[in-house]
UniProtKB/Swiss-Prot annotation:
Modified residues (Phosphothreonine): 84, 584
Domain of life: Eukaryota
Organism lineage: Eukaryota, Metazoa, Chordata, Craniata, Vertebrata
Name listed for the protein in its UniProt record: Inactive phospholipase C-like protein 2
Record function comment: May play an role in the regulation of Ins(1,4,5)P3 around the endoplasmic reticulum.
Cysteine-cysteine disulfides: none
Organism per entry: Homo sapiens
Record-annotated PI-PLC X-box domain positions: 426-570
Modified sites of kind Phosphoserine: 17, 1113
Comp. bias regions, Basic and acidic residues: 1106-1127
Record-level GO cellular component terms: cytoplasm
PI-PLC Y-box domain: residues covered: 618-734
Gene3D superfamilies reported for this sequence: C2 domain (2.60.40.150), EF-hand (1.10.238.10), Phosphatidylinositol (PI) phosphodiesterase (3.20.20.190), Pleckstrin-homology domain (PH domain)/Phosphotyrosine-binding domain (PTB) (2.30.29.30)
Domain C2: from-to ranges: 734-863
Main location as per UniProt: cytoplasm
Length: 1127
């Protein structure tokens, strides 16, 4: 067995710079030899169970004594697995009452001493529940039977107790207890609310809170003093059952029994009955098994026929029924059992005022508070209901049943990918060098590099996928017709003319933006002229041959070059007067053949430079993509023209990326750089494109014929701008003066880190992996969440394994990632089958961070080769905090927040150039003011969220919805109202209220004051920072000469230039953060306003009709204009 976190890289073809933390499982056996960061930390063996640690998502804690006793667990083949705590294996909701629990079993006394690694080692068991939860009645029944829960106390002690609901549903009891039985209970009528997660003072201040899963924790708030009973379930399933059941009891009180009897979801039952009757046209009262199975499959296409048949047979067997006819009652029972997703039911009841369906207002609340949808109204809600609700009754009444809600959540409307990015959404008017360009290497090959066949289908496929740079390796062919193949190899040949014809047909099939033909020319003068004839005749005026403007400093934009084809190739020098001349030959194929037998790889600079004859006609087709040889960065900065392009072998590019990352980034701000795979990758494996994107390299050529992790990254990355083949690089890679190191393992100066919160809830309809072992149809899935980006962002987390359930596994595990450069980050979901011999690939989905939609989302899984897997998906929840907000992420709890004295302020560096240092010195006060405004606002908002009983992931609309029930008295008269007549909504007490509510109102007032301070002072502070930035930029052009006059030499002068760049980056970043914080604050005020109106808490007559609907919380804020940057 291999420990998670050990192990080597996936068998790469060559060593490269350390890549993201991606395991061999993450590499998914995708192309033998995938290197360049594709290896990562995970070994091929099974993960080791670490009995001392706690899995996020597993609700057991490290224990000792009798409670730590573990018994061997049998796998599906009867193989004994590593011992696991019994609390891990969940057969829910039916649990036998424990007979021998110790009376006071404190399992951990001092959590602060329980130090554990952040990297978890997991392979936990999670067996399917015995019965699906599909209604409130199921939850109540489970609670009456009882469950073992862990009771958390403020003294860092945790007690095992058996909790159950009294049969009369009036009290919540637990046993054993030191108290007598009458005191070890809470009256249901005294319960104020039920909170999910670790959102009480006891959880936040508890020393072992970090070892408790957020998904398994919940709290019962009861009594006039709002005391909390803090509990931890053995699984998120059990926690959901208790939370749902208790909330139902609170809502209906003494009427619960009546509601349960009358709320067996009559609308749903009627609809399913109607489906049955449409088949039973003769009113026989039964239908054939075949018809019953087909009907359920039509209603839920993802279900397997074998599973439906098995369920009917099990039902008949339990009734000792002969024959295969299916009655209406049996049909309804099986439909409910197979087509109810408990995780979606639990979500529905959170927002349903009826507890069995969503009306238009419930749906509006869900869309606004959870999904971040702006400008929502009842008409839009009705449209959604009419589109997705299957029952006619629901459509007529405006009700969305569990089936309609499931249909909606599984529709493309709720996919994780933001539909705004399905079209071109970026500025396409910047220089060509400011974009990443989707690029193909040896496009003509459809297999390996040495013996594989060449085919025009390679060009068709690449162009249809949005590729904007293809390669043509052209050689002399028979009958005076040039051919394309990899020279010095045994690859087959295709005629040049047929390739140009295909390019003409498909060049702009997927994108209207310019296509680059990377021409590697090895032809004689005679056949070069034939090439020119073919290109001119077939491509015509699509060819861009305009001479570059020597007065310009940057390449034209993709917008200007729409519909144009650029030739990247060698070009004769301007002083060549003849009809032909000689140029250097950059032959990738020759390099490969030279290296094939060499064990030690030399650098490309050691390969002898050859020269060949180039005809003038072909040279004249080359305009702004003239191929030149790279020498060194300082030479390029001085002599290279903006229209000249250098190509880098992967090995050489990796060397520069590791040794000269700053120079490489600066070089790519002005010039195009093409990186092609090492010639040693004869199997057509791919390098990691992120290794070179992080340095700003625009044209990273990929072997499109080889699927796997690296192509997943490439395909996923270029989806973010309408799949047009061009993606605008991060601002920090484009701005003339900016400080950025490609290999940073810390936060990026001037860029706000953001926290990505991902909860993997469930999976649906996972197919059996191709070529997997002899396990029949058994699938034991688990999920990896990977972050790809700069080294500081590369990370991965995995869920537990759910054994023998590929149809509807429940994971319920939450992960958190800090993203330091969001514009270059990608998220990859990988589903694997936990096979005993080698984990098999099931599916994956890769998405740029900037394309994530927050809220509850489905992730459509794709196969190894990129095809969508029918009906296979992950159900996840996504939240992003500190997005455009700035500052380091806050830790949990009030006690760890930093006051002004301990607050960390952005620091500026000293250049030791007096005049320049004076300017930067003047920037320190506004930087401090900006930090104080932002952090005071953030701290106040977090304090209010905590008092509302929510985590920092929640938004203020959710906070207002959560706290609104507390503001109502026993007769539903408001104890607190919001005055919305002014810009800053105020809370007003209505008579005498409990101290707990006074505390909420006081905290709310403090939050409003911090929001007000930021809004009213942000503009002035922003202008001061921008003014200092502009003043400093006046020294930029002559900084070297000024430093020399000050006596700085060589190293110190270079250090001064670096410090100047750092300071400018910090100033720009601080200005941006303040601007974003103001936008966030205005959004917060809008959310408060509309939540108050939605809950009916606004003071009559104070609603401000002029307030606009809140923008989507993730709406991209436009970048500042260049005149604000001081450039």
């Amino acid at each position: 067995m291999a420990e998670c976190g050990r192990g080597g890289a996936a068998g790469g073809a060559l060593p490269t710079s350390p890549g993201p933390a991606l395991g061999a499982k993450g590499a998914l056996k995708a192309g033998v030899g995938e290197g360049g960061g594709g290896g990562g930390r995970l070994g091929h063996g099974r993960a080791r169970y670490d009995s001392g640690g706690v899995s996020n998502g597993d609700c057991s804690l490290g224990v000792s004594g009798d409670e730590a006793r573990a018994s061997p667990t049998r796998g599906p083949r009867g193989v004994a697995l590593a011992p696991t705590p019994s609390a891990v294996v969940c057969t829910l909701p039916r649990e036998s009452k424990p007979g021998g629990l110790p009376r006071r079993s404190s399992i951990i006394k001092d959590g602060t001493k329980q130090k554990r690694e952040r990297k978890k080692t997991v392979s936990f068991s999670s067996m399917p529940t015995e019965k699906k939860i599909s209604s409130a009645s199921d939850c109540i029944n489970s609670m009456v039977e009882g469950s073992e829960l862990k009771k958390v106390r403020s003294n860092s002690r945790i007690y095992h107790r058996y909790f159950l609901l009294d049969a009369d549903m009036q009290s919540l009891r637990w046993e054993p207890s030191k108290k007598d039985s009458e005191k070890a209970k809470i009256d249901i009528k005294s319960i104020k609310e039920v909170r999910t997660g670790k959102n009480t003072d006891i959880f936040r201040s508890n020393g072992i809170s970090d070892q408790i899963s957020e998904d398994c924790a919940f709290s019962v708030i009861y009594g006039e003093n709002y005391e909390s009973l803090d509990l931890v379930a053995n699984s998120a399933d059990v926690a959901n059952i208790w939370v749902t059941g208790l909330r139902y009891l609170i809502s209906y009180g003494k009427h619960t029994l009546d509601m349960l009897e009358s709320s067996q979801d009559n609308m749903r039952t009627s609809w399913v009955s109607q489906m049955f009757s449409e088949i039973d046209v003769d009113n026989l009262g039964h239908i054939t098994l075949c018809n019953a199975v087909q009907c359920i499959r039509n209603l839920n296409p993802g279900l397997k026929t074998s599973k439906i048949e098995l369920k009917f047979k099990e039902l008949h067997k339990s009734k000792d029924k002969a024959g295969t006819e299916v009655t209406k009652e049996e049909f309804i029972e099986v439909f409910h059992e197979l087509c109810t997703r408990p995780e979606i039911y639990f979500l529905l009841v959170q927002f349903s005022s009826n507890k069995e369906f969503l009306d238009t207002k419930d749906l509006m609340m869900f869309l606004e508070a959870e999904q971040g949808v702006a400008h929502i109204n009842e008409e839009i809600s009705l449209e959604i209901i009419h589109k997705y609700e299957p029952s006619k009754e629901g459509q007529e009444k405006g009700w969305l049943s569990i089936d309609g809600f499931t249909n909606y959540l599984m529709s493309p409307d709720c996919y994780i990918f933001d539909p705004e990015h399905k079209k071109v959404c970026q500025d396409m008017k910047q220089p060509l060098s400011h974009y990443f360009i989707n690029s193909s290497h040896n496009t003509y090959l459809i297999e390996d590099q040495f013996r594989g066949p060449s085919d025009i289908t390679g060009y068709i496929r690449a162009l249809k996928m949005g590729c904007r740079s293809v390669e043509l390796d052209v050689w002399d062919g028979p009958d005076n017709e040039p051919v394309i193949y990899t020279g010095h190899t045994m690859t087959s040949q295709i005629v040049f003319r047929s390739v140009i014809d295909i390019i003409n047909k498909y060049a702009f099939f997927a994108s209207e933006y310019p296509l680059i033909l990377c021409l590697e020319n090895h032809c004689s003068i005679k056949q070069q002229k034939v090439m020119v004839q073919h290109m001119k005749k077939l491509l015509g005026d699509k060819l861009y041959t305009t001479s570059p403007n020597v007065e310009e400093s940057y390449l034209p934009s993709p917008d200007v070059l729409k519909g144009k084809i650029l030739i990247k190739a060698k070009k004769l020098s301007s002083n060549c007067s003849g009809v032909e001349g000689d140029v250097t030959d950059e032959d990738e194929g020759a390099e490969m053949s030279q290296r094939m037998g060499k064990e030690n790889m030399e650098q490309p600079n050691n390969v002898p430079v050859k020269r060949f004859q180039l005809c003038k006609e072909l040279s004249e087709l080359v305009s702004i993509c003239k191929s030149v040889q790279f020498k060194e960065f300082q030479v390029s900065f001085q002599v290279q023209k903006y229209w000249e392009v250098c190509s880098f072998n992967e090995v050489l590019a990796s060397k520069y990326a590791n040794e000269n990352p700053g120079d490489f980034v600066n070089y790519n701000k002005r010039f195009l750089a093409r990186v092609f795979p090492s010639p040693m990758r004869i199997d057509s494996s791919n390098m990691n494109p992120q290794d070179f994107w992080k340095c700003g390299c625009q044209i990273v050529a990929m072997n499109f014929q080889t699927p796997g992790l690296m192509m997943d990254l490439n395909i996923g990355w270029f989806r973010q701008n309408g799949n047009c083949g061009y993606v605008l690089r991060p601002a920090i890679m484009r701005e003339e003066v900016s400080f950025f190191s490609a290999n940073t393992k810390d936060s990026v100066p001037g860029v706000s880190p953001q926290l990505l919160h991902i909860k993997i809830i469930s999976g649906q309809n996972f197919p059996k992996p191709k070529g997997s072992g002899a396990k029949g149809d058994v699938v034991d899935p688990y999920v990896y969440v990977e972050i790809h980006g700069i080294p500081a962002d590369c990370a991965e987390q995995r869920t537990k394994t759910v054994h023998q359930n590929g149809d509807a596994p429940i994971f319920d595990e939450s992960f958190e990632f800090q993203i330091n450069l969001p514009e270059l980050a990608m998220v990859r979901f990988v589903v694997l089958d936990d096979d005993y011999i080698g984990d098999e690939f099931i599916g994956q989905y890769t998405i740029p961070f900037e394309c994530l939609q927050t809220g509850y989302r489905h992730v459509p899984l794709q196969s190894l080769t990129g095809e969508v897997l029918a009906h296979a998906s992950l159900f996840v929840h996504v939240a992003i905090t500190n997005r455009r907000g700035g500052g380091k992420p806050h830790k949990r709890g009030l006690s760890v927040r930093k006051g002004k004295k301990s607050r960390e302020y952005a620091s500026l560096r000293t250049l030791w150039i007096k005049t320049v240092d004076e300017v930067f010195k003047n920037a320190q006060p506004p930087i401090r003011d900006a930090t104080d405004l932002r952090e005071n606002m953030q701290n106040a908002v977090v304090s209010f969220k905590e008092l509302c009983g929510l985590s920092s992931v929640a938004n203020l609309m959710q906070c207002m919805l959560a706290v609104s029930p507390r503001f109502l008295g026993p007769d539903n008269t408001p104890l607190v109202v919001l005055n919305l007549s002014e810009q800053y909504p105020t809370m007003e007490l209505q008579g005498i209220v409990p101290e707990v509510l006074k505390k909420i109102v006081t905290t709310y007032d403090m939050m409003i004051q911090s929001l007000k301070a930021l809004i009213e002072n942000a503009d002035a502070v922003y202008e001061k920072i921008v003014h200092c930035q502009k003043a400093a930029m006046e020294f930029h052009e002559h900084l070297h000469s000024i430093g020399t006059k000050e006596g700085l030499k060589e190293r110190k002068l270079q250090k001064a230039v670096e410090s100047f760049t750092w300071n400018i980056t910090i100033l720009k970043g601080q200005a941006d953060l303040l601007k974003y914080a103001k936008n966030e604050t205005l959004e917060n005020l809008k959310q408060i306003h509309f939540a108050a109106v939605s809950c009916g808490l606004n003071k009559p007559g104070t609603e401000n009709a002029d307030v606009q609907k809140p923008r989507r919380s993730l709406e991209v804020i436009p970048e500042k204009a260049n005149d604000e940057t001081g450039e």
